[in-house]
Amino acid sequence: MQLTLFCFVCLLPGHLALPLSQEAGDVSAHQWEQAQNYLRKFYPHDSKTKKVNSLVDNLKEMQKFFGLPMTGKLSPYIMEIMQKPRCGVPDVAEYSLMPNSPKWHSRIVTYRIVSYTSDLPRIVVDQIVKKALRMWSMQIPLNFKRVSWGTADIIIGFARRDHGDSFPFDGPGNTLGHAFAPGPGLGGDAHFDKDEYWTDGEDAGVNFLFAATHEFGHSLGLSHSSVPGTVMYPTYQRDYSEDFSLTKDDIAGIQKLYGKRNTL
């Protein structure tokens, strides 16, 4: 099967940039080059027809997703959105399921943590992973079981640069992590960039609990939401409180896939 990858990312390396055009608006040539790569990555086709769009149409798709006037022109504010750390899946409206709605069919999904960050004690990473998975399992008839060796449905780890899955990390900033849709092999696995500064709720660095909860949403089969403030919103904010929870939109999406958990 074809694997679907999702990741937190800020900017992508530029290539094949077009000459500065009218659509560039009030931005520099370098920013226009960055914007082209961003649009090709996150808005490659029309959300309804699935046809490949021009860059102008891609930009309008982005503006529509974020509730902005669909001018088809860049602005400093749009560039600001593009430069926020985020997950690397193309954007869609409200909650969305991945193509073909992949999901886990067993009621017990195993996970294994194979590598750690030096920023947090291992026991803290273990606790955060457990807490992030529990946020989802509290809403659906699915349970997670940790294994210490051998194979597991979801392999979780921290890695640098090229780490064997054809999606290398890029050092501090930009890409923060990525996860694969449910399935065999790499399916469901969640990787985090070891070069980031991972924290347990500090102001600086990346809040690992929030990032893990977001990525595990992808590991379960969710795509992105256009609703600001949701866990599955594509851009990463640094002001999430430690007592955040899944929103109604997040819950609606995951229950669309798995149904509601019986609390009786």
UniProtKB/Swiss-Prot annotation:
Tissues expressed in: Expressed in the intestinal epithelium (at protein level).
Signal peptide: 1-17
Binding site for Ca(2+) 2: D170, G171, G173, T175, D193, E196
Assigned protein family: Belongs to the peptidase M10A family.
Protein name: Matrilysin
Binding site for Ca(2+) 1: D153, G185, G187, D189
Cofactor binding comment, as recorded: Binds 2 calcium ions per subunit.
Top-tier EC class: hydrolase
Compartment(s): Secreted, Extracellular space, Extracellular matrix
Amino acids binding Zn(2+) 1: H163, D165, H178, H191
Maturation-removed propeptide residues: 18-94
Binding positions (Zn(2+) 2): C87, H214, H218, H224
EC number(s) stated in the UniProt entry for this protein: 3.4.24.23
Enzyme active site: E215
Gene3D superfamilies with a match to the protein in the record: Collagenase (Catalytic Domain)
PROSITE patterns on file: CYSTEINE_SWITCH, ZINC_PROTEASE
Reactions it catalyzes: Cleavage of 14-Ala-|-Leu-15 and 16-Tyr-|-Leu-17 in B chain of insulin. No action on collagen types I, II, IV, V. Cleaves gelatin chain alpha2(I) > alpha1(I)
Keyword Translocase carried by entry: no
Keywords: Calcium, Collagen degradation, Extracellular matrix, Hydrolase, Metal-binding, Metalloprotease, Protease, Secreted, Signal, Zinc, Zymogen
Swiss-Prot/TrEMBL domain comment: The conserved cysteine present in the cysteine-switch motif binds the catalytic zinc ion, thus inhibiting the enzyme. The dissociation of the cysteine from the zinc ion upon the activation-peptide release activates the enzyme.
Ranges spanned by the short sequence motif Cysteine switch, renumbered to the chain: 85-92
Cofactor needs: Ca(2+); Zn(2+)
Annotated source species: Mus musculus
Entry's Gene Ontology molecular function annotations: metalloendopeptidase activity; peptidase activity; zinc ion binding
